Amino acid sequence: MLVILKETARKLGNVGDVLKVKKGFARNYLIPSGKAVRATRANLAILENSKEKLAAQQAAELETASELAKSFTEIDVLPIYAQAERGVLFGAVSAKQVVAELSKKGIEITTKNVVLGAPIKALGEHEVRIFLHSRVECSLKIHILDASRRGADGTITGTS
């Protein structure tokens, strides 16, 4: 079944792309969630009329994502504090925590942009991938530290 994407999907494509997908995927997920519409003659005509506007919008989004990616190069390691005992976390560090720490540094993204390879359940350094656009991705090192060793001023107390 041919569909036209109404929003960017990480592994599918960008807004305005005409894709051939399985009928069940289109009927059960893409169309009901508003991510795509059927590629009828009328919808293709509407797409054709708005191609220039769409191209300008995508170029602006790509430029914004590239600028945002440059701000990630300024961050060497992002510290995240979590409750731990004997080097093992009580829960996993989530994308929500990564987004919260980045917002403290003035970088605004959503949890949809952050991809954790596996649940982070141990102290130490971990790699996190950030998808800002279908063509722009970057990686970020995060350092998980024990929250009980964090001082009142934010510095680490004691020895490891």
From Swiss-Prot:
Classification via SUPFAM superfamilies: L9 N-domain-like (SSF55658), Ribosomal protein L9 C-domain (SSF55653)
InterPro entries: Ribosomal_bL9, Ribosomal_bL9/RNase_H1_N, Ribosomal_bL9_bac/chp, Ribosomal_bL9_C, Ribosomal_bL9_C_sf, Ribosomal_bL9_N, Ribosomal_bL9_N_sf
A GO cellular component annotation in the UniProt record: ribosome
PROSITE patterns: RIBOSOMAL_L9 (PS00651)
Pfam annotation, one family: Ribosomal_L9_C
UniProt GO BP: translation
GO MF entries: rRNA binding; structural constituent of ribosome
Record's keyword annotation contains Endoplasmic reticulum: no
Keywords, comma-separated and alphabetical: Ribonucleoprotein, Ribosomal protein, RNA-binding, rRNA-binding
Keyword DNA-binding carried by entry: no
NCBIfam families, per database record: L9
Protein task: Binds to the 23S rRNA.
Cited HAMAP family: Ribosomal_bL9
Family assignment from sequence similarity: Belongs to the bacterial ribosomal protein bL9 family.
Protein name listed in UniProt: Large ribosomal subunit protein bL9
Species: Neorickettsia sennetsu (strain ATCC VR-367 / Miyayama) (Ehrlichia sennetsu)
